[in-house]
A protein has these predicted regions:
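Acidic, metal-coordinating helix/loop segments flanking the phosphotransfer/catalytic sites
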Residues: 23, 37-65
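Residue-level signal for the "D+5" position in two-component response regulator receiver
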Residues: 37, 72-75
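Alpha4 helix (beta4-alpha4-beta5 surface) of REC/receiver domains from two-component response regulators
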Residues: 4, 20-24, 79, 102-117, ...
């Protein structure tokens, strides 16, 4: 795999409606060109670490940012975040958690685990663009 298969953003979301809305926000922030969507937590980890159907994929090909829903099939977003932070290759990878509700205990837990940011769905374009820009993700600017 080479530059043509590089990915800027791994978007982990199982709800097709939320996928569509968030991809629109990414495009509005000039970040929608190289996005990989994973539909569950296991697929996200397989993509990151080159396992399963992504066997042979190298982490050097991206992503530079993970957008992570908390309520996922097969493995929760919290479990994915734990795996990402526990691995030396991904411990510093920016992760923004996206969720459709605010649960104070969950918010405390994701920050304890080292999340880079937290946004409530549906995404506010300006808030997302600002946070992505602060995390150093290129192209993160609003129209």
């Amino acid at each position: 795999m080479g530059a043509e298969t590089a990915v800027d953003i791994l978007f982990v979301e199982d709800n097709p409606f939320d996928v569509d809305l968030t991809l629109r926000t990414l495009r509005a922030c000039h970040m929608g060109d190289r996005v990989q969507v994973a539909r569950d937590g296991k697929e996200a980890l397989d993509f990151l670490f080159g396992a399963g159907k992504y066997e042979g994929r190298r982490l050097e090909e991206g992503p530079r940012l993970v957008l992570l829903d908390l309520k996922l099939p097969k493995m929760t977003g919290l479990q994915v975040l734990q795996w990402v932070r526990a691995d030396s290759r991904t411990k510093d990878l920016p992760v923004i958690v996206l969720t459709s509700f605010e649960d104070d205990r969950e918010v405390v837990e994701i920050f304890r685990l080292g999340v880079s940011g937290y946004l409530v769905k549906p995404l506010n374009k300006d808030e997302f663009c600002d946070l992505a820009h602060k995390l150093g993700v290129e192209g993160a600017r609003a129209n």
